[in-house]
Amino acid sequence: MSDARKLSAMDASFLYLETPEMPMHVGSMAIFRLPDDYKGDFFEEFKAMIASRLHIAPILKARLEKAPLDIDHPSWVEDDQFDIDRHIFRGSLPAPHDRATLERIVGWMHAKLLNRARPLWEFYVFEGMKDREIEIGRAHV
């Protein structure tokens, strides 16, 4: 992403309407059943896979920048301080390691606003469900 790209009125409206009580990002959740003989580190492999594909979607390395005097919609600009470790996190699902616990965590996560000083996306990889890894994503893109 070489030049600033101004948000459309529609995209900017999601930012303007967002409040701490009403986040406007979208979310996803995927539960992966790992093969019985899997010996790898799912988190590290997932992070490496995302990192290897960032060039396909440069917007994932862009942050918001307000217009001078805030007289226009914000723009996406390349984040020179981009660090994938600020966007992909590892967690452990607390006991009792069940679907209800997972749903409570997802609800808590989606209630938090994304940090507008950084590119507006995050992934969390949770371990703790029997032979499964859970990926939870949030994004404003």
What are the residue ranges of the model-derived segments?
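Non-catalytic N-terminal regions of enzymes
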Residues: 1-139
